[in-house]
């Protein structure tokens, strides 16, 4: 534990995480200053009167006067104001680093381009099924510092690459990178390897590394084979096995669960289940409890979520697919009796969409593209694509042609902020329109 008494602390970024940082320092007798580049950030009205605040931009004088800056994951470390502070010797960390310095419970740490929230929640459910007290948070739901107030046997953290950049003291009992696909190109101008390097920090000082046998980018750079356990579709310590039309989860050759017993569907979710099972095994959660959780967990909203089944048509909300890799995962191995009606579009974040082309083949797919980068997506296969301005217009086109046996899938491969408040807002609108049009 670190003594912060007498330290001049600046917190950048409010919201739930920023407020948890304020509470953390006040509880330790330190009154921080707070700044946010937004004029009216969430949580501003909840700050104690003793806390000085600066909104609308960054206060460089405060930053250079600080001993410690706790920065929101949403603020790039490459920002000139932060670069100047770092060069002046000011320590810059994030809330996860604060958590790691204080935490006493074993930690399961989960990162990756796609599937993080599902696997994080699933490991938490496995621990609960075993009767363990468990805290689940980080980049999902509850801020990590809030979990410090709980007396948990296990902490399960979802960690983004941005959070890992400012974390130095993580010592996970088990850590995984689920996958690495192009994302956040605006924050990683040097490309995929720069993004991967941030993800790889999750393995530092980890007792066990859980790696994806199908994705070499998830492997530790330095030799850590003795600490590595793998999962994958066909290969890996934890893998899938198809027999007589049924798919089983297998661990080192032993069949442990028929996927028919799971509420989750889709090959990407089966590999998520394998990763969660490997993590749970690594920290000693009884296998029977983990398998029980796999049969009851129905998934998270906006993640390949069935929102309507009517007249033989299934409408699936995968709005959380905010990058190409996530949409590829949704489409990989997807089987549809009739025609797949795929909705793509939004803000592509300068991504390369060409990887989607192989999933858009055949005559049983129709593509509906919308939003800022809809034109680029429609160009992948113009003969089966229609371009509209909005998702609502695209869904109106879908509703005119769907037939029993068809599937309508919103898996946009793009961020939502060009037309929606969040991916949740986009997903809720999809569900509302499906109910209206289906």
Curated annotation (Swiss-Prot):
Pathway where this protein functions: Cell wall biogenesis; peptidoglycan biosynthesis
GO term, biological process aspect, one: cell wall organization
InterPro entries with a match to the protein in the record: Mur-like_cat_sf, Mur_ligase_C, Mur_ligase_C_dom_sf, Mur_ligase_cen, MurD
Main function: Cell wall formation. Catalyzes the addition of glutamate to the nucleotide precursor UDP-N-acetylmuramoyl-L-alanine (UMA).
Domain of life: Bacteria
GO molecular function, one term: UDP-N-acetylmuramoylalanine-D-glutamate ligase activity
Encoding gene (name): murD
Record HAMAP family: MurD
Record-given protein name: UDP-N-acetylmuramoylalanine--D-glutamate ligase
One CC-aspect GO term: cytoplasm
Record-listed E.C. numbers: 6.3.2.9
NCBIfam families cross-referenced by the UniProt entry: murD
Catalysed reactions, as listed in the record: UDP-N-acetyl-alpha-D-muramoyl-L-alanine + D-glutamate + ATP = UDP-N-acetyl-alpha-D-muramoyl-L-alanyl-D-glutamate + ADP + phosphate + H(+)
Pfam families recorded: Mur_ligase_C, Mur_ligase_M, MurD-like_N
Binding site for ATP: 112-118
Compartment(s) of residence: Cytoplasm
Major location category of this protein: cytoplasm
Keyword line: ATP-binding, Cell cycle, Cell division, Cell shape, Cell wall biogenesis/degradation, Cytoplasm, Ligase, Nucleotide-binding, Peptidoglycan synthesis
Native organism: Yersinia pseudotuberculosis serotype I (strain IP32953)
Family named by the database record: Belongs to the MurCDEF family.
Top EC class for this record: ligase
